[in-house]
Amino acid sequence: GGETSGETKGMWFGPRL
């Protein structure tokens, strides 16, 4: 969910924005 977290869904948005 972070900027470069690379979560399961490949989302680049989150607390690391």
From Swiss-Prot:
One of its GO terms (molecular function) is neuropeptide hormone activity. Keywords: Amidation, Neuropeptide, Secreted. InterPro entries: Pyrokinin_CS. The modification Leucine amide is found at L17. Transmembrane segments: none annotated. Its main location: secreted. The keyword Protease does not apply. Disulfide bonds: none annotated. Belongs to the pyrokinin family. This is Pyrokinin-5. It comes from Laxta sp. (strain Australia). The lineage of its organism: Eukaryota, Metazoa, Ecdysozoa, Arthropoda, Hexapoda.
